[in-house]
């Protein structure tokens, strides 16, 4: 998720 960087880092984009 590019919009949610915090979630992206945890999920791995």
UniProtKB/Swiss-Prot annotation:
Instruction: Give tissue specificity per the record.
Output: Expressed in the brain, frontal ganglion and terminal ganglion (at protein level). Not detected in antennal heart (at protein level).
Q: Which residues carry this modification: Phenylalanine amide?
A: 13
**Which BP terms from GO are recorded?**
neuropeptide signaling pathway
Q: So which domain of life are we looking at?
A: Eukaryota
Gene Ontology cellular-component annotations: extracellular region
Compartments, record wording: Secreted
Q: Which UniProt keywords apply?
A: Amidation, Neuropeptide, Secreted
Spell out the protein name for this chain.
Allatotropin-related peptide
- Species for this entry: Periplaneta americana (American cockroach)
């Amino acid at each position: 998720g590019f919009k949610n960087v915090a979630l992206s880092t945890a999920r791995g984009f």
